[in-house]
Amino acid sequence: MTDMSHQCVIVGIAGASASGKSLIASTLYRELREQVGDEHIGVIPEDSYYKDQSHLSMEERVKTNYDHPSSMDHSLLFQHLQMLKSGQPIELPVYSYVEHTRTPNTIHVEPKKVIILEGILLLTDARLRNELNFSIFVDTPLDICLMRRIKRDVNERGRSMDSVMAQYQKTVRPMFLQFIEPSKQYADIIVPRGGKNRIAIDILKAKISQFFE
């Protein structure tokens, strides 16, 4: 955990795929933005840092294990966190789930008082953990995560139910048990029931609000 006197405070939200991380992050961002303004708080998804696969064929890209730490460009994310905390802007990568690689575009992100960083593998990397001012693990039962993942990937990412189920059985569940669940030990706060846990969200809001004082 880092010194809270840094210019940019980084709050990490980790947990299984479809556990409710993004919902908690977006709820905190929306409600805190109403209090402090858009210039003081932002959200960065770890998904933006999947490695560039433009040099691979589509056949090779779709075989990528997206739930293994090696699929992430954590070195770039680590560099970007350091830049934000030192007051420098970053160019956030844009990842396409349809093309299974980065796009040529980036999003310009200015340092904020608080940045909420959310993703499945955040707490598996000691470099990233050391840049977080505090961290949250969203602890949602895997059967609920699976139902949410099917709905999301079919409706929003254009995938078939069979492909979602095959990926879940082959990589998502095994990688959760091997990497993501063990990383829960590094979280400062564990939130059960995901984005439906209003009491937990209010507690997190109160904690993050301290950084604006």
UniProtKB/Swiss-Prot annotation:
GO terms for biological process: CTP salvage; UMP salvage. It holds the Pfam family PRK. It catalyses: uridine + ATP = UMP + ADP + H(+); cytidine + ATP = CMP + ADP + H(+). Its EC number is 2.7.1.48. It is an enzyme of class 2 (transferase). Disulfide bonds: none annotated. GO terms for cellular component: cytoplasm. Pathway: Pyrimidine metabolism; CTP biosynthesis via salvage pathway; CTP from cytidine: step 1/3; Pyrimidine metabolism; UMP biosynthesis via salvage pathway; UMP from uridine: step 1/1. GO terms for molecular function: ATP binding; cytidine kinase activity; uridine kinase activity. ATP binds at G15, A16, S17, A18, S19, G20, K21, S22. Keywords: ATP-binding, Cytoplasm, Kinase, Nucleotide-binding, Transferase. InterPro entries: P-loop_NTPase, PRK/URK, Uridine_kinase, Uridine_kinase-like. It is found in: Cytoplasm. Belongs to the uridine kinase family. PANTHER family: URIDINE KINASE. HAMAP family: Uridine_kinase (MF_00551). This is Uridine kinase. It comes from Klebsiella pneumoniae subsp. pneumoniae (strain ATCC 700721 / MGH 78578).
